[in-house]
Amino acid sequence: MEDDMWCVSSSGSSRSYRSETAAKYQSGPYQDLEEFEEVDDDIAVEYPCPFCASDYDLVELCHHIDEEHRHEANNGICPVCSKRVKMHMVDHITSHHRDVLKSEQKEMSYREDPYLSDKYLQPHLDELPPSMNHHQHPSKHVSDQFLSFINNSALPNQTKLVLPDSSVEDKNPIKDSSAAKEGTSSCPLSDSDKLEKAKKCEFVQGLLSSAMFDDECDSSE
């Protein structure tokens, strides 16, 4: 009988202990600890430098190798695939592990990193054989086809020729002749022409004055 009472009391105490423990984890510092563990899960993976004992995430590792081990980086073991490469380590990572770099770009927000830009990656992708160059985006090919379609569709508009208007051609000789007349009339006179013109004016003035003088004489008589 006493054993049964002890079992009942022990089971009740264990249930109460579990409920109290669960309440502690649902509130207070234990809840903060769980949030901290969730944050730790989102931290980017660090890779060991193949030339020293330092650990970096993949983007920082590319910077580190390019700045600190530039001359010795042509032969080493890749920290991502654990294979020995016989090319520059940064070139190998940017060409063969581009997906990992892109994922770290989203997690760590390396938006302006030169090692993640197409300007840096494209030369390395062009050097690879077609069987290995599987990182090219199909969207670029589609955009090129769209641009070529636009350029080809604009060609018929460019082939239209503007025919000259016959009425405009008919008016041009008239304008040219009138312009020629104006040019001849506006030419400056020579000295001999000016002298002859002055003599004619004096002769006309003399005739007018003599005619006026004769009229006055007749009226006086």
From Swiss-Prot:
- Top-level taxon of origin: Eukaryota
UniProt PTM comment: Not phosphorylated in vitro by CPK3 or CPK11.
Tissue note: Expressed in seedlings, roots, leaves, stems, flowers and siliques.
Where does it reside? Cytoplasm; Nucleus
The residues forming the signal peptide are: none
Relate the induction remark in this record. By high-salt stress, but not by abscisic acid.
Tell me which InterPro entries the record gives.
DI19 (IPR033347), Di19_C (IPR027935), Di19_Zn-bd (IPR008598)
Main localization (coarse): cytoplasm
Q: Where is this region: Disordered?
A: 1-24, 162-193
Keyword tags:
Cytoplasm, Nucleus
Provide the Gene Ontology terms for cellular component: cytoplasm; nucleus
Q: Which family does it belong to?
A: Belongs to the Di19 family.
What this protein is called in its record is Protein DEHYDRATION-INDUCED 19 homolog 2
Name of the gene encoding the protein in the UniProt record? DI19-2
